[in-house]
């Protein structure tokens, strides 16, 4: 094959298109892999009592910190286990929505209870929030004690779609 002006022009155009495509993919892939976490600041739930964020958004995931049964004004819910679970799940719902997700897009949930005997009662309230079809991966972890004498704490990971 002899190199003519037409062949060289075609070769140059193909090479340029390939390089531009590769560069565009590189930029897109690089930006996806190097996005920084975004720390949530919100007033829809009580302000954290420690050095942490209520949730952190990274790429298409929302990581929700452990939620205790505080009302938005910072007062405690010292009611029954069922009342505490409702306050916690209401707060989870608010945080997820603020971060661009919702209960239906949860990937995993970790529930801490102060006694494994609380599991059936906690599960009944939990099911009211999630229904029959929404079943994110979940662990229920019995712990010795939680801050302020609370009976339940929940942390979760949600997908942002």
Regions found by a protein language model. Give the residues of each.
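N-terminal presequence-like segments and the immediate start of the first folded domain
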Residues: 2-90, 94-107, 113-161
